[in-house]
Amino acid sequence: MITLEVDLGTRSYPIHIGSGLLDRADLLAPHVRGQHAVIVTNETVGPLYAARVEAVLAGLGKTVRTVVLPDGERFKHWETLNLIFDALLQAGADRKTTLIALGGGVVGDMTGFAAACYMRGVPFVQMPTTLLAQVDSSVGGKTGINHPLGKNMIGAFHQPNAVIADIDTLRTLPPRELAAGMAEVIKHGAIADADYFAWIEDHIAGLNACDTGLMAEAVRRSCEIKASVVAQDEREGGLRAILNFGHTFGHAIEAGMGYGEWLHGEAVGCGMVMAADLSHRLGFIDVETRARIRTLTQAAMLPVVAPDLGIDRYIELMKVDKKAEAGSIKFILLRKLGSAFITTVPDADLRETLRHAILKPPTEAPVA
């Protein structure tokens, strides 16, 4: 097992990475101090892993309740969030009750938001079961739900008490979900560590095959990068925005297609290709770097050609973004591989990138 720390002073917390961690009572016990624990999971993950976590908590003498949510991004809204609140109130949960997010990014985001809101804040633990959640969304305290007009526009910063990432759970992921997680792995190399990006290029076949050793290293290095950024800028006042590389385009794809049509990681992967193209058009990266990002994204089984929402529709959607200021769209671009920054861009260059990225006719269908 590897243990990292997110250094936030009195709110610091561990990230445990390894095999068999779902059964480790010693990892959960320090963070479940009250009598009640509520596991939040979904219809897919619950049947696979909930009983194991319930057994650990029961062994600690805790009263356990499990809430099973519908599975998918399209359910990341108020009505589903209220299922968690209903369960907490029906169980008589108090301020010492610990919520446990057992699932992927949607479960983690919603559980964290519920924990932030219930009685104005209760503790929660992240137990991510998808690659995307293990390398990205479980770390950093961003929680929330979607709105029809924009992704993650309603939420709160609420740090978990711990992250327990059992890499054995990755073996049950469908290939599409595994690929979606690889988008965030690639992102971390692109924005912060060129050597890590090269390592991903060298090991992409093994990563696609979910090799245990390679996955453990990818989760470790990605969490190190994200933890370092979060420690320097918890509330996304500046540096932390670089973690949104590919997300401005990606969120527009998700909203424009309808939440759940594209997985978050698929949209981010395509968004990174678009952001790399925009970085090149503005003279920041060379054609080789742009090609490396596209090639690696495609090798990770992610889409590299965007759906045709219409250029004006893309721009409309991107204006509903947390980074936008006074109607100006902000993008995370690359100065070079391993170095990112936030900026506005000329409208003409943005439109040219969108024209270049949009899905071609069926005779020129993209490789996803």
From Swiss-Prot:
Q: What class of enzyme is it?
A: lyase
Q: Which GO terms describe its biological process?
A: amino acid biosynthetic process; aromatic amino acid family biosynthetic process; chorismate biosynthetic process
Chain positions recorded as NAD(+) binding sites: 71-76, 105-109, 129-130, 142, 151, 169-172
State its cofactor: Co(2+); Zn(2+); NAD(+)
Question: Which residues of the sequence carry a binding annotation for Zn(2+)?
Answer: 184, 247, 264
The record's keywords, sorted A to Z, are: Amino-acid biosynthesis, Aromatic amino acid biosynthesis, Cobalt, Cytoplasm, Lyase, Metal-binding, NAD, Nucleotide-binding, Zinc
In the Enzyme Commission scheme, what number(s) does this protein have? 4.2.3.4
Q: Which reaction does it catalyse?
A: 7-phospho-2-dehydro-3-deoxy-D-arabino-heptonate = 3-dehydroquinate + phosphate
Q: Which InterPro entries match?
A: Dehydroquinate_synthase, DHQ_synth_AroB, DHQ_synth_fam, DHQS/DOIS_N, DHQS_C
Per UniProt, subcellular location reads as: Cytoplasm
- Which cysteine-cysteine pairs are annotated as disulfide bonds in the entry? none
Question: What is an example of a GO molecular function annotated in this UniProt entry?
Answer: metal ion binding
Q: How is the cofactor bound?
A: Binds 1 divalent metal cation per subunit. Can use either Co(2+) or Zn(2+).
Q: In which pathway does it act?
A: Metabolic intermediate biosynthesis; chorismate biosynthesis; chorismate from D-erythrose 4-phosphate and phosphoenolpyruvate: step 2/7
Q: Name one GO cellular component term.
A: cytoplasm
Summarizing the function annotation, the protein's role is: Catalyzes the conversion of 3-deoxy-D-arabino-heptulosonate 7-phosphate (DAHP) to dehydroquinate (DHQ).
Alphabetical list of PANTHER family matching this protein: 3-DEHYDROQUINATE SYNTHASE, 3-DEHYDROQUINATE SYNTHASE, CHLOROPLASTIC
The similarity annotation says: Belongs to the sugar phosphate cyclases superfamily. Dehydroquinate synthase family.
Designated name of the protein: 3-dehydroquinate synthase
